[in-house]
Amino acid sequence: MTTNFLVHEKIWFDKFKYDDAERSFYERMNGPVPGPSRQENGATVILRDIARARENIQKSLAGSSGPGASSGPGGDHSELAVRIASLEVENQNLRGVVQDLQRAVSKLEARLSALEKSSPTHRASAPQTQHVSPMRQVEPPAKKAAAPAEDDEDDDIDLFGSDEEEDKEAARLREERLRQYAEKKARKPALVAKSSILLDVKPWDDETDMARLEACVRSVQLDGLVWGASKLVPVGYGIRKLQIQCVVEDDKVGTDLLEEEITKFEEHVQSVDIAAFNKI
């Protein structure tokens, strides 16, 4: 009686099995890889690395064992073949250069022979003496056949003169030029040394006629003396002095002579001083 109600109840007694199956499914789909499969993947990675390393080693060995690095007989033969080919090319180039040089030399020889045949001096007779002048008189062929003795005499004639005559002519021209230069220099006027002098002419007192004093100073006339501007400069106590400019030639007029000539006018001139002296 107590268990009959269980017959009518709808209870899922196998639900845990379905839960376990669902959990295992999702674990396989999203969960960690099981131990055996993880080991298989690690072994696959190691094998792949080993294969990659072997491939790299083979590539490096193939690169180092090139044509230049071959040490066997085959490598030596290939190197010799390359060197022989380069030597053959150089030989051909040198042969072409030699042929070009030979052709150029043959052309030069032909041109020289043609020039020698066409030049008039080649047809002229050889000189009798070893010492010859730069140029000789060449006679026409008919005249040479008529008088061979005259040709020998003409060969001794120097149309341009000897070296001694040339030296004499050069010496004469040099002397002529020196003489002309000396004459030209003599005709050129010589430079005259001149000086500019500023004189201070002092009177006796303030009653001295300064116009008369200046007239007396300017009355001094000498060869090589030229008077210039003048002015009156006050000294003191109403006394003024005459300051006058003049230009003299040094060879003709001296300062002492000039002072003596001015101080001759004793009535007006007390003293003469040189205020400035400049060479021109």
From Swiss-Prot:
The modification Phosphothreonine is found at residue 129. The modification N6-succinyllysine is found at residue 117. Residues 149-168 have a biased composition (Acidic residues). GO terms for molecular function: guanyl-nucleotide exchange factor activity; translation elongation factor activity. InterPro entries: eEF-1beta-like_sf, EF-1_beta_acid_region_euk, EF1B_bsu/dsu, EF1B_bsu/dsu_GNE, Transl_elong_EF1B/ribsomal_bS6, Transl_elong_EF1B_B/D_CS. Residues 139-148 have a biased composition (Low complexity). Residues 113-170 are annotated as: Disordered. The modification Phosphoserine is found at residues 37, 60, 86, 106, 119, 133, 162. One of its GO terms (cellular component) is eukaryotic translation elongation factor 1 complex. The modification N6-acetyllysine is found at residues 17, 107, 117. Disulfide bonds: none annotated. Residues 116-132 have a biased composition (Polar residues). Belongs to the EF-1-beta/EF-1-delta family. EF-1-beta and EF-1-delta stimulate the exchange of GDP bound to EF-1-alpha to GTP. EF-1 is composed of 4 subunits: alpha, beta, delta, and gamma. This is Elongation factor 1-delta. The lineage of its organism: Eukaryota, Metazoa, Chordata, Craniata, Vertebrata.
